[in-house]
Amino acid sequence: MLHVTRQWLAAPKDVFRARKDFESSSRFARVAPYLLHLSERGTPDLHYLSVRRGNAGKVVLYFHGGAYVMGSARTHLAPLSRLARLTGLQIVVPDYRLAPEHPAPAAFQDAVAAHVALLAKGYQPQDIILGADSAGGGLALALMADLCARNLRPAGLFAFSPWTDFAMSGDSLRRNAAIDPALPVGRMRETVDLVLQGFPPQDPRISPLYAPFNAPPPVFVQVGAEEILLDDSFRMAQVLRDAGGQVTCDVWNGCPHVWHMLDGYIPEARAALVATAAFVATLQALVPIANR
């Protein structure tokens, strides 16, 4: 699955074809057993992933990655099914609108709508844990800033290799350009143009690095040491700490962008997901279902 995103970013390819290929690649996902996948039509559509055992009243609202131009609940079934099994929690994945058909801030608007939908189902703000990867990580952090400003603070947030700065100003873009195994800088900049289409790159709804945070909840970030987006994690962590937040930045050597997608193929993916489940347990006083 990771190779499809890499191919799209590395070489000229129609975004719609790349999106289709990414969806098709999900057939290779090693989905954790006993996964229940239900869908609900709406704006946006919501996908509910769970195992047969769970913790009532607790939920993860997860925003998939894919550079805002591809991805879905289906493409992320491997890591999300494993997280559902490790935590025992239901994971809700919105099908937020994608660029270039729906440029920024469409995804942010859908993220807010997904959160409203969970509140309408009876969840309290403190029962909602935000999770995400890559571009979805930026989206989740942008939503968290908005929720904190409106006193709807979530329990916490975890993010895998988050993309937090659409101004592309991090020094690791230059420093790690030759060693990042997944993301070429040039194609990332082209993707920025597809997503923004004139929208300000430093707007907090697309770049949470520039958002004000009012007493943010605990945050857990995992990122590869060789990623060009490494500084997106480091700088985001500092912004949150400056706002009084508690942040763990878990850096992994030798792991590509969102290596969690390779659960079932490489041991580092499972280990990272187990660590994430342990973080989730600290938020909700749960006992993680280790190594399932």
Language model segments and positions:
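Hydrolase active-site cap/lid region
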Residues: A145-F199, A215
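Serine-hydrolase catalytic core
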Residues: P200-C255
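Catalytic active-site module of serine/aspartate enzymes centered on a nucleophile-bearing elbow/loop
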Residues: Y265-R292
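A glycine/proline-hinged amphipathic helix-loop "lid/cap" segment
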Residues: M1-G54, A285-R292
